[in-house]
Amino acid sequence: MVSKVSVTRRAGRVRRKLKAVATERPRLSVYRSSKHIYAQVIDDVKGHTLAAASSLDKDLREKLKTGADVDAAGVVGKLIAERAKKAGIDKVVFDRGPYIYHGRVKALADAAREGGLEF
């Protein structure tokens, strides 16, 4: 089992590299729980959330069988891309946090790219 310390370190390494690479772009942050997936576009300079989507949104809850599969992640990815575009954002930096770029995280990223976000 992975300890909380190693998960926190891994997330910190990822975020430190992101801040070094892209300071002017907002960050597309992903959180994955055992039952749902969440995504938000964050402006780190101001500390504001510009757009957010999750498998808990009322529109999606009725459509999705579960919030914990690859299909749900794809729908959330399309929704976050749509909301970010509406907020005037088209270029972001993808923050996978401590999660491996595989499965639900990859599905969300691919759907966000298809939706028009560039990262």
Swiss-Prot record:
<dbReference type="GO" id="GO:0003735">
    <property type="term" value="F:structural constituent of ribosome"/>
</dbReference>
<keyword id="KW-0689">Ribosomal protein</keyword>
<dbReference type="GO" id="GO:0006412">
    <property type="term" value="P:translation"/>
</dbReference>
<dbReference type="InterPro" id="IPR004389">
    <property type="entry name" value="Ribosomal_uL18_bac-type"/>
</dbReference>
<comment type="subunit">
    <text>Part of the 50S ribosomal subunit; part of the 5S rRNA/L5/L18/L25 subcomplex. Contacts the 5S and 23S rRNAs.</text>
</comment>
<dbReference type="GO" id="GO:0022625">
    <property type="term" value="C:cytosolic large ribosomal subunit"/>
</dbReference>
<keyword id="KW-0694">RNA-binding</keyword>
<dbReference type="InterPro" id="IPR005484">
    <property type="entry name" value="Ribosomal_uL18_bac/euk"/>
</dbReference>
<comment type="function">
    <text>This is one of the proteins that bind and probably mediate the attachment of the 5S RNA into the large ribosomal subunit, where it forms part of the central protuberance.</text>
</comment>
<keyword id="KW-0687">Ribonucleoprotein</keyword>
<comment type="similarity">
    <text>Belongs to the universal ribosomal protein uL18 family.</text>
</comment>
<protein>
    <recommendedName>
        <fullName>Large ribosomal subunit protein uL18</fullName>
    </recommendedName>
</protein>
<keyword id="KW-0699">rRNA-binding</keyword>
<dbReference type="Pfam" id="PF00861">
    <property type="entry name" value="Ribosomal_L18p"/>
</dbReference>
<dbReference type="GO" id="GO:0008097">
    <property type="term" value="F:5S rRNA binding"/>
</dbReference>
